[in-house]
A protein has these predicted regions:
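Sec-dependent signal peptide recognition
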Residues: 1-9
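Histidine-centered copper-binding motifs that mark active-site loops
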Residues: 8-180
Length: 180
């Protein structure tokens, strides 16, 4: 039995050998943005629209502290991330967690295992997903040499968002089409 336990401990340490802990702090607040000659109060992360990109390697652990300085409760959803053994970090408001209330903090902790690619993160409460979102880039553990194409000269994540020109409480739900 002791040999079996030693084997599993050694296997776990070997698997975690190249993994890193990637930490981010998301300060959610409201800023005034001018779009199409209109000043609009928009809820954003770290004063940015769209929010910051998170770049990790497959196998890394992620910790994102959300500091909510906005007047709205919110959650952050890691879209497309396989949250095996970390499902409580999914950020589905009122399903896997209650919203992070104004002037409160919450730290999301999860591992990115068994996948790579460009995904995204976004708010998962009401229309806040229109302005609280950003790229989540999971690179292969073995580096760019494992991609089936030549290494690009430069990488620029493109995040397309939606601007809402009405108050958060007056925004109507989309009745048809694909809205993710």
């Amino acid at each position: 039995m002791a040999v079996l336990v030693m084997f599993f401990v050694a296997a776990a340490l070997a698997a975690a050998g190249g993994a890193a802990l990637v930490e981010h702090t998301f300060v959610v607040s409201q800023v005034k943005l001018n779009r199409l000659c209109n000043d609009t109060l928009v809820t954003v992360v770290n004063g940015q629209f769209p929010g910051p990109a998170i770049e990790v390697n497959e196998g890394d652990s992620v910790a994102v502290q959300v500091i909510n300085k906005s007047p709205y409760g919110l959650t952050i959803h890691w879209h497309g991330v396989k949250l095996q053994l970390n499902c409580w970090a999914d950020g589905a408001g009122m399903i896997t967690q209650c919203p992070v209330q104004p002037n409160k903090n919450f730290t999301y902790r999860f591992d990115v295992a068994g996948q790579e690619g460009t995904l995204w993160w976004h708010a998962h409460v009401g229309s806040l997903r229109a302005s609280i979102h950003g790229a989540l880039i999971i690179r292969p553990r073995s580096g760019a040499s494992s991609y089936p194409f030549p290494k690009p000269h430069k990488e620029i994540p493109i995040v397309i968002g939606l601007q809402i020109y009405t108050s958060r409480t007056n925004a109507r739900c989309q009745e048809s089409g694909l809205l993710n």
